[in-house]
Amino acid sequence: MARKGPKRHLKRLAAPTSWYIERKAYKWAVRPRPGPHNMRTSIPLLYIVRDYLGYAKTAREARKILNEGKFLVDGRVRKDYKFPVGIMDVVSIPETGEHYRVLPNRIGKLILHPISEDEAFIKPLRIRNKRMIKGARVQLNFHDGTNHIVSIAEKDNYFTSYTVLMKVPEREILEVLPFEKGAYVFVTQGKNVARKGRIVEIKRFPMGWPDVVTIEDEEGELFDTLKEYAFVVGTDKPKISLP
């Protein structure tokens, strides 16, 4: 039997556990569109308007608010109620002056962390990989599915797992944060999700085993997590506010 295309429906009981939604109130949930984030690390914009912030009581009201262009994601108006909003994205409401950054909490749920207006123009982007393209240029691919092109002379300034502080919506690089000992990181997944601290040691393993980092939190406690889960957010101290 031939494939019928991608799934378009999602039951609430099967929705990602990172969503703050009532699972037994209704049968169906909004399935996010394919976009910058995967379904597990993002949440549809409709739930932010209705369930998280309470600006609407029904999905119809939430869609109407979005169609009026009252919500910005990373400085751009988003009207698609299925648009996936993920980790480190900035949600802004110009009419009320509210700004939030999407981050996980200690139980792995995605939350809206209030931030200042000045910080709303800064978005940390983790470099997943980079590749050469035509014209002797290098394309940096980030964790949110976006990319940025730099000259080949600058390629040695950017490496995998480094974080780029990007000015949004202009997409201008403000600063590069290297992934190294002493860097301040925020854990985005795993059993230590939402913990933060400085890198003490980077353990590299052969035969394709994932690298592990040892982190010292603000209380002086040491813990390990996968390198992939550690998101650099500063050098001596974080460049953004954290929960």
Curated annotation (Swiss-Prot):
Q: Which residues form the S4 RNA-binding domain?
A: 43-105
Which family does the similarity line name? Belongs to the eukaryotic ribosomal protein eS4 family.
| UniProt superkingdom | Archaea
What's the protein called, per UniProt? Small ribosomal subunit protein eS4
Q: Which gene encodes it?
A: rps4e
Gene3D superfamilies, per database record: 2.30.30.30, 2.40.50.740, RNA-binding S4 domain
Q: Which UniProt keywords apply?
A: Ribonucleoprotein, Ribosomal protein, RNA-binding, rRNA-binding
Question: Can you cite a GO biological process for this protein?
Answer: translation
| Assembly with partners or alone | Part of the 30S ribosomal subunit.
Species of origin: Pyrococcus furiosus (strain ATCC 43587 / DSM 3638 / JCM 8422 / Vc1)
Which Pfam families does the record match to this protein? Answer: Ribosomal_S4e, RS4NT, S4
Q: Give one GO molecular function term.
A: structural constituent of ribosome
> Which PANTHER family does this UniProt record tie to the protein?
30S/40S RIBOSOMAL PROTEIN S4, SMALL RIBOSOMAL SUBUNIT PROTEIN ES4
Kindly give the PROSITE patterns that the UniProt entry links to this protein: RIBOSOMAL_S4E, S4
Entry GO CC: cytosolic small ribosomal subunit
